[in-house]
Amino acid sequence: MKKIDAIIKPFKLDDVREALAEVGITGMTVTEVKGFGRQKGHTELYRGAEYMVDFLPKVKIEIVVTDDIVDTCVDTIIRTAQTGKIGDGKIFVFDVARVIRIRTGEEDDAAI
């Protein structure tokens, strides 16, 4: 099993969610986050004064999947989240040792 964390632009969330549903992903955790990478921040004008905004709004999607669909999920996220512009985000893939569904006690693949 693998955990996929994807940090994407907020306006791409619906597209990514729908595309993942089409490949069989039925659940995910979504968190509003802020951060920066090579994109750094940007300046905003407020009441005539210019301010530097260091952290940019992003969305973090977390899904846990079986090993056989990891590449499909990663490819789907790339295809739907990519704009070709700086700040499109990153995808991280982690090994998952164990999953337990609290309600039923199901474990591993059955709990996903």
Swiss-Prot record:
The keyword Ribosomal protein does not apply. InterPro entries: N-reg_PII, N-reg_PII-like_a/b, N-reg_PII/ATP_PRibTrfase_C, N-reg_PII_CS, N-reg_PII_urydylation_site. GO terms for cellular component: cytosol. Belongs to the P(II) protein family. It comes from Klebsiella oxytoca. PANTHER family: NITROGEN REGULATORY PROTEIN P-II (PTHR30115), NITROGEN REGULATORY PROTEIN P-II HOMOLOG (PTHR30115:SF11). The gene is glnB. In nitrogen-limiting conditions, when the ratio of Gln to 2-ketoglutarate decreases, P-II is uridylylated to P-II-UMP. P-II-UMP allows the deadenylation of glutamine synthetase (GS), thus activating the enzyme. Conversely, in nitrogen excess P-II is deuridylated and promotes the adenylation of GS. P-II indirectly controls the transcription of the GS gene (glnA). P-II prevents NR-II-catalyzed conversion of NR-I to NR-I-phosphate, the transcriptional activator of glnA. When P-II is uridylylated to P-II-UMP, these events are reversed. Homotrimer. Transmembrane segments: none annotated. The keyword Phosphoprotein applies. Keywords: Nitrogen fixation, Nucleotide-binding, Phosphoprotein, Transcription, Transcription regulation. This is Nitrogen regulatory protein P-II. It holds the Pfam family P-II. GO terms for molecular function: ATP binding; enzyme regulator activity.
